[in-house]
């Protein structure tokens, strides 16, 4: 058999084997995607209930404070409230009171620990480098808490201040596994390492699409503080022991932890979806390549057979 035919056969066998590997990797990613999606649903329900409870508790205290001051209870005055006047100095006010004179901003950035996930990691890095540049333009120091080795290594190579690094988060992370990460982030904020914290991650939309998100995590700003929430709290008619402030001192850190955990879980879901899509594309490409190589092989065989037949006929004619 000519060398060209042997070479084509080897290429076809090699590509088929690669296609089997990428298909297996696609199936693994699909399984992990289903697991993280299921876990994400349960987390979302829990976190929404905690947020509503906190919003109602804070709203009731804010409205009571405005009434004591004999101030109009409206959106404008609620927005101007100083939480230290309501809750005093402590964790509650620290976690919800916007800081003045921002000097340093923390970014908890979630990337992957490996490749073969399409444009997942490159999109995270590209977006973050632009954000860092904008933040520095405002005169703010940039401090990064990197979850995932791809982002961490890139940032350190490009002289970004990485103050915390966590690699090897499991493909379907549990709350207990992520707890040291989020506890460190909250502790750094409360200790003044940075004045505000943003969580930056890839949000999973569906199996084919995702969206990069930058969400302010600390101080907590996604609460619904208003008269409506205060009235909803009163309608429940339950007593709080020992008092609302002490309850909030427990609930607010817990809410921050669960919210950051949710972002990491969401990012893992998006990573698995990106990996699944990339492996599906690789498998499809392998099939197309096998088809093209098989066509070339068949044509080469046909040409070889035609040549051999021609030689036989020519030889027979020569003997006549």
Swiss-Prot record:
Q: Which domain of life is it from?
A: Bacteria
Keyword Ion transport (UniProt): yes
Which Pfam families does this entry report, sorted A to Z?
A: ATP-synt
Q: Which UniProt keywords apply?
A: ATP synthesis, Cell membrane, CF(1), Hydrogen ion transport, Ion transport, Membrane, Transport
The answer on whether this UniProt entry bears the keyword NAD reads no
CDD domains assigned to the protein according to its UniProt record, in alphabetical order: F1-ATPase_gamma
Biological process annotations from GO:
proton motive force-driven plasma membrane ATP synthesis
Q: Which GO terms describe its molecular function?
A: ATP binding; proton-transporting ATP synthase activity, rotational mechanism
A GO cellular component annotation here is: proton-transporting ATP synthase complex
| HAMAP family noted in UniProt | ATP_synth_gamma_bact
- Homology family: Belongs to the ATPase gamma chain family.
Q: What does this protein do?
A: Produces ATP from ADP in the presence of a proton gradient across the membrane. The gamma chain is believed to be important in regulating ATPase activity and the flow of protons through the CF(0) complex.
Q: How does it assemble?
A: F-type ATPases have 2 components, CF(1) - the catalytic core - and CF(0) - the membrane proton channel. CF(1) has five subunits: alpha(3), beta(3), gamma(1), delta(1), epsilon(1). CF(0) has three main subunits: a, b and c.
According to UniProt, the name of this protein is ATP synthase gamma chain
Q: Which organism is it from?
A: Lactobacillus helveticus (strain DPC 4571)
